[in-house]
Amino acid sequence: MTPSPEAQTLPKAQAVEYLRDHQVAVEVGFSLPTFLQVEVPASLSRTKVERSLRIGAYSYTGAGTEMRSARIGRFCSIARRVIFGQAEHPTGYVSTHTIAFNPTAGFASDEYFAALATKRPVPYAGDVVLGHDVWIGDSVIIRAGVSIGSGAIVGAGAVVTRDVLPYEIIAGVPAKRIRMRFPDELAARLLQTGWWDHDVRSLKDSFDRPEAFVDAFERERASLPKLVFATITMEQVDRGTFTVRTYEAAAPG
C-alpha cells in the first residue's frame, strides 16, 4: 500500500467527519488521540481515546470505554466501560499525589502547590496490546503494559495486571486463569492459521467446528487470499489540526 495522494491537513471536526465518511463509527465530537491508525471498517462509538491507538479491521468498542496508548488487532470485541492503560502514580515517592511528580496537574494555580510540586519521572509501563479475535467483557480494567494474546477472553469486571496467553480465559480481581478455550494442540494450530489475515469465506460453514475449520484451512491455505484493508492514519499537528493519510487497498476477490 502507498499513501493516498489525497493526504491532507484538517481541523479536528473535519478529521472526525472524515472517519465517519470512511466506515469508522465515531460520534460527533469524538476526541481524537495524538496518533490514530485504523483499518476500515472499525467502530469506536462513544469511546474516549488518549495518546495513541492502532486498531484493526472489524474491531469494535462499547460505550464508555476509555483507552490510553493501545494497539488492537482485527476482529476484537470490546464491551462497554472497559479501561485501558490509565496513567499510574509512582509508589516509591513520599506521596502518590501529583504534588510529588506533576506540577501542572489540578492545583497549579495554588501558591502552596506551585511552590512544592516538582516534575519527576514516572516510568512508562508501555502500551496495552491486544492480539486478534480478543473478547473483553464489560467493565474490565487493563493495566498499562499488559499484552493479551489472540483468541483470549477476559471476563466482565476483571482487573488484568499480567499478560494473557492466546486462547486463555481469565476473570476475577486480580484476573486469573479460568481455563483454556481449546486443548493445547488445537489452540496452537488455530493460532498458526492466522485466519484473521485471510479471506476465509469459503470456510464459513465450519466456524462452529474449530477442528474442522483448522483442517480445511491447512488444506486450502495456498488458495486463501490475504485480507488487505484500507488504513487511515491521523497525526496531531497542533491542538486543533490533524494530518490525515489514507492507504488504499483492494478488497479480496
Predicted regions and their residues:
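C-terminal segments of enzyme domains that contribute to small-molecule binding surfaces
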Residues: T2-V16, D21, A25-V28, I99-I142, ...
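Glycine-rich, phosphate-binding/catalytic loops in enzymes
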Residues: I78, S95, I170-A171, A187
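Acidic, glycine-centered active-site loop in nucleotide-sugar glycosyltransferases
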Residues: P166, A171-P174
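Catalytic-loop Lys-Pro-X-Asn motif of eukaryotic-like protein kinases
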Residues: D138, A156, P166
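Flexible, glycine/small-residue-enriched loop-and-beta-strand segment within the central core
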Residues: D21-V146
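Short, solvent-exposed beta-strand-to-loop segments that form ligand-recognition rims
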Residues: D163
